[in-house]
UniProtKB/Swiss-Prot annotation:
Coiled-coil annotated residue ranges, if any: 215-271
HAMAP family attached to this UniProt entry: RRF
Name the record gives this protein: Ribosome-recycling factor, chloroplastic
Pfam family, one: RRF
Protein origin, superkingdom: Eukaryota
NCBIfam families: frr
Organism, as annotated: Arabidopsis thaliana
Gene Ontology CC: chloroplast; chloroplast stroma; cytosol; thylakoid
Keywords annotated in UniProt: Chloroplast, Coiled coil, Plastid, Protein biosynthesis, Transit peptide
Length: 275
């Protein structure tokens, strides 16, 4: 096999093979030599051998017919852009913000639930969770009526629309307040009888159950945040040490909110047991 270099493109040498070749001037990979040897029609076969020497660039075209090179093989290159420090910090910040927001919402939900549980004294917050069917849609009682506490054992409800009196009365009866509303056609009065010892114990169990549900919600928030940190580690955006530090900070934050739940629980328990 005889070979010659084209002089028309000095910067891109072209290796041409004559049909009657004996030995190439440059050493070719075995895979290329096998293709050349098995070629049935050298006039139609074009080979792009991916090899590099001092004289032949990577991916140079090889024409078996000895004619000009028709095509130059182009290599596809995959470029992976690494995340910047700013992008990584933004992702971490988003996770932390989401965690705090969810924890605050958990505390607020628990506080609302506790306020709706009746204690020894009348409290407008006892009606926070009551919804009234108003013109075909459920709305909060406090949004359609003014609620006041004339004394420590009664509540007074004055609706903005008197046509809603019946609906308000029905909603109170169907609630778990355990009181009978007095509808005089203008306002609704609620007289709160003293809590019995058994009723106080029942409500104490309800408070304990809701408190535990709040703690479970916090643990679930922590679990989801840890999964997000693990994902960033797998994406090589965080190191193992970074994740350990973030997990430690997350646990400290969880402990703070767990303490808040415990404080709310103890305060409500104290109110329930106060005669």
């Amino acid at each position: 096999m005889a070979a010659s270099f084209s002089s028309t493109a000095p910067t891109t040498p072209v290796l041409r093979f004559r049909a009657n070749y004996s030995k190439p001037l440059l050493s070719l990979p075995d895979s290329c030599l096998r293709i050349i040897s098995s070629a049935i029609s050298p006039s139609t076969r074009l080979i792009a051998c991916s090899f590099k020497t001092d004289k032949l660039p990577l991916g140079a075209g090889v024409n078996l017919s000895g004619g000009p090179v028709v095509k130059r093989s182009l290599q596809k290159r995959l470029v992976i852009r690494s995340a910047t420090i700013e992008e990584i910090e933004a992702e971490k910040s988003a996770i932390e913000t989401d965690v705090k927001s969810k924890m605050e919402k958990t505390i607020e939900t628990l506080r609302t639930s506790f306020n709706s549980i009746r204690t020894g004294r009348s409290n407008a917050a006892m009606l926070d969770k009551i919804e009234v069917e108003y013109y075909g849609s459920p709305v909060s009682l406090k949004s359609i009526a003014q609620i006041s506490t004339p004394d420590g054992s009664s509540l007074l409800l004055q609706p903005y629309d008197k046509s809603s009196l019946k609906a308000i009365e029905k909603a109170i009866v169907n609630s778990d307040l355990g009181v009978t509303p007095n509808n005089d056609g203008d306002v609704i009065r609620l007289s709160l009888p003293p809590l019995t010892s058994d009723r106080r114990k029942e409500l104490s169990k309800v408070v304990a159950k809701q408190s535990e549900e709040g703690k479970v919600a916090l643990r679930n928030i922590r679990r989801d945040a840890l999964k997000s940190y693990d994902k960033l580690e797998k994406e090589k955006k965080l190191s193992e040490d970074n994740v350990k530090d973030l997990s430690s900070d997350l646990q400290k934050l969880i402990d703070v909110y767990m303490k808040k739940i415990e404080e709310l629980y103890k305060q409500k328990e104290k109110e329930l047991m106060k005669v």
